[in-house]
Curated annotation (Swiss-Prot):
Name of the protein in its database record: Imidazole glycerol phosphate synthase subunit hisF1
GO biological process, one term: L-histidine biosynthetic process
Pathway(s) of this molecule: Amino-acid biosynthesis; L-histidine biosynthesis; L-histidine from 5-phospho-alpha-D-ribose 1-diphosphate: step 5/9
Top-tier EC class: lyase
Catalytic residues identified in the record: 11, 130
CDD domains in alphabetical order: HisF
Alphabetized UniProt keyword annotations: Amino-acid biosynthesis, Cytoplasm, Histidine biosynthesis, Lyase
UniProt-recorded Gene Ontology molecular function terms: imidazoleglycerol-phosphate synthase activity; lyase activity
Quaternary organization: Heterodimer of HisH and HisF.
Catalyzed reaction equations: 5-[(5-phospho-1-deoxy-D-ribulos-1-ylimino)methylamino]-1-(5-phospho-beta-D-ribosyl)imidazole-4-carboxamide + L-glutamine = D-erythro-1-(imidazol-4-yl)glycerol 3-phosphate + 5-amino-1-(5-phospho-beta-D-ribosyl)imidazole-4-carboxamide + L-glutamate + H(+)
Annotated InterPro entries: Aldolase_TIM (IPR013785), His_biosynth (IPR006062), HisF (IPR004651), IGPS_HisA/HisF (IPR050064), RibuloseP-bd_barrel (IPR011060)
Main location: cytoplasm
E.C. no: 4.3.2.10
Length: 255
């Protein structure tokens, strides 16, 4: 059994870590480096940093904080936001990031996934998918979700896009379930299972974790990692206690 990963997500905006609910009303959560160091020292397996405004504002991620994070932690981390070219990715990887994740730029230029995979290896290339479930249960891919003024339906369905990004060379998929984001009432297991069934690469669940049981429910579907933000930032769940709980439930977890 592959070891399951517990991942903390740090949404970055204007040089600070923020957190919203359903991708809206972002509140300040603290300093990037301090939080990165805290998570590294408290048992998290991996960190994902999303510069949530970079793509919407057509900005680049600040290389300075990426480099500082790399100097201050000893765990794997992934960076996302505004990565539109091989040059952008190369700079972030050179500054210490282990992986890069693309979301809106991949929707605008799907060949970017293939180019990045060829340049840096599929293990470095994560595709983030912001998936919204409408009132009829249809799963739709949204883009530019870091700013509610720019957030819009991309015209693509989630399941079709999941298949497509794998064909193009994605090494991992993070499924951001927008309806669940920050609500803490559990991952959307129905959506997660539908995506998992067509996923041949590692799948990470994002959006909805509120208690330890929610992580267990998601992992029981077979996914590789579970990502959360609110419950970790607000210290509602202790990471080490969560890992012990999951290990006691029979999962392969790094303690």
């Amino acid at each position: 059994m592959l070891t399951k990963r517990i991942i903390a997500c740090l949404d970055v905006k204007d040089g600070r870590v923020v957190k919203g609910t359903q991708f809206k009303n972002h509140k300040d959560m603290g300093d990037i480096i301090e939080l990165a160091r805290y998570y590294s020292q408290n048992g998290i397996d991996e960190l994902v940093f999303y510069d949530i405004a970079a793509s919407a504002r057509k900005e680049r991620i600040s290389r300075e904080w990426v480099s500082e994070v790399a100097k201050n932690i000893n765990i794997s981390f992934c960076v996302a936001g505004g990565i539109k070219s091989e040059e952008d990715a190369a700079e972030l990887l050179a500054n210490g990031a282990d992986k890069i994740s693309i979301n809106s730029p991949a929707l605008n230029d799907p060949s970017l996934i293939t180019r990045l995979a060829k340049s840096f290896g599929v293990q470095c290339v994560v595709v983030g998918i912001d998936s919204f479930k409408d009132e009829n249960g249809n799963l739709k891919v949204f883009q530019y979700t870091g700013d509610e003024k720019t957030s819009k339906h991309s015209g693509k369905s989630t399941l079709e896009w999941v298949k497509k990004v794998q064909d193009l060379g994605a090494g991992e998929i993070v499924l951001n379930m927008m309806n669940q984001d920050g609500v803490k009432n559990g991952y959307d297991l129905e959506q997660l299972e539908a995506v998992y069934k067509i996923c041949k690469v590692p799948l990470i669940a994002s959006g909805g974790a509120g208690k330890m049981e929610h992580f267990l429910e998601a992992f029981k579907l077979g996914i590789d990692g579970a990502l959360a933000a609110s419950v970790f930032h607000q210290k509602l769940i202790d990471i080490k206690e969560l890992k012990i709980y999951l290990k006691n439930q029979g999962l392969s977890i790094r303690i």
